[in-house]
């Protein structure tokens, strides 16, 4: 029972890692390492990796935004036992000076962008990092929190997946097995020195934190037939593209101008009773339009109208890497008892979007079904804190796509 409490305690902490937007006038936060838009941002320490951060503010009034970086522990609590000079080379709290006003769009916005490392700062220690953006014109108001990871691959992670699980065989679940090799790092008490996080499609709400290992030996640890590493298989993500406001594109039934804004209508979704074979980006999104030029400030904003035909099945939410509003009700579908359907309207920038319907806890909604064939992506993060160390370092990262 004590171990279960420990896992649940840190499960709640892991949820805090998600990107969040706090201002109603800030939209479309993206954090991309190099060109890997389908993954969360993971940088390798000492490499040439670049983290690109972009967002929009819904006006043509240039604002003074300040970026502050905070180093966090494995559970995303703020690091308190290391100095800023231990992990940051350069200066913190620097202004975001690179911005561009939108061009030929029906919604005015200003696009802001910057990157890490830059002339002001460079990260010099592995671990979890939270980037906070403040609006100086609004009295140092916090408008954005964004997460990123910096890994130094000092340990080796082996990760595999099977649909022949300890619950069922080729039905509704997927089970992971994991092997960790310490390599040159000295581990005496794994319970105190090793911290592991395993996620499905980067969903922090359903992360498995410190699942108990079955085997421990001098050179590593092994997780095999571990029920804590069994995940609901879910179904493929929904997807659509809004590339041109003059006509519908992939996944869009119709798009129209209502006199003041563009309204886009993805095809109505119904209960999924079978596996959907259409591959998607597992919650990722990518801003683009049919012109493919200067997309950062030429893509327009449209109001996307979601409809899910189903009997009432409790609260249902949209979930993707783009659902970053700090208020989760911004993505809650409202039930229409007259027409027996769920509906939501969300303001989104032109581009490709993938998403799923979930419960408030981040689990797949009853409308989606669970099918062993689903091509989920899994992520394993391993942190190390030696007995004399002051902080957790991220020493291993491994991704796996279930095919």
Q: What is each model feature region?
A:
Residues 192-275:
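Long, internal scaffold/assembly segments composed of regular secondary structure
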Residues 61-90, 188-211, 313-324:
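Extended low-complexity, serine/threonine- and proline-enriched intrinsically disordered segments
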Residues 150-171, 373-396:
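Low-complexity, Pro/Ser/Thr- and charge-rich linker/hinge segments at domain boundaries
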Residues 106-136:
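Ligand-binding face of N-terminal immunoglobulin V-set domains in extracellular IgSF glycoproteins
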Residues 87-113, 204-213, 303-349, 362-388:
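Aromatic-rich carbohydrate-binding modules that target alpha-glucans
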Residues 25-71, 169-180, 291-306:
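Contiguous beta-strand segments within globular domains
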Residues 265-312, 392-403:
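Basic K/R-rich, polyanion-interacting modules in nucleoproteins and related proteins
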